[in-house]
Amino acid sequence: MQRVTITLDDDLLETLDSLSQRRGYNNRSEAIRDILRGALAQETAQQHGTQGFAVLSYVYEHEKRDLARRLVSTQHHHHDLSVATLHVHVSHEDCLEIAVLKGDMGDIQHFADDVIAQRGVRHGHLQCLPDDE
């Protein structure tokens, strides 16, 4: 292992210390290593041609004009990526969908971009995991 020095502004350091305490890290180095591993795994997983898994989560307004129909159409267009989908009614206006995806990470990223870009979709997030086999 090598020792490196980094410079962080006060707010970022405070956030790191808070995260470290909440997650039970013994020191900042452990927290930074874990964060870095996660970021690098995301970067690797999102490369086109890489096979992997992903979880796409998003909130959308179900009564927004034609949005539900457009989302279903997008999902059917990418049916080969979908492993499972969970649909939750979070309020009178909003729904939460969580899709478990498997396949080429470039295709998954394209699908996620299509969904998240729809007008009426909020809080879209894609979490990628490389297939290590």
Curated annotation (Swiss-Prot):
Its cofactor is Ni(2+). This is Nickel-responsive regulator. It comes from Enterobacter sp. (strain 638). The keyword Transcription regulation applies. Pfam families: NikR_C, RHH_1. Ni(2+) binds at residues 76, 87, 89, 95. Belongs to the transcriptional regulatory CopG/NikR family. Binds 1 nickel ion per subunit. SUPFAM superfamilies: ACT-like (SSF55021), Ribbon-helix-helix (SSF47598). Transcriptional repressor of the nikABCDE operon. Is active in the presence of excessive concentrations of intracellular nickel. Keywords: DNA-binding, Metal-binding, Nickel, Repressor, Transcription, Transcription regulation. GO terms for biological process: response to nickel cation. The gene is nikR. Homotetramer. HAMAP family: NikR. It comes from the Bacteria. NCBIfam families: nikR, PRK02967.1, PRK04460.1. GO terms for molecular function: DNA-binding transcription factor activity; nickel cation binding; sequence-specific DNA binding. InterPro entries: Acetolactate_synth/TF_NikR_C, ACT-like_dom_sf, Arc_rbn_hlx_hlx, CopG, CopG/NikR_regulator, Ni_resp_reg_NikR, Nickel_NikR_proteobac, Ribbon_hlx_hlx.
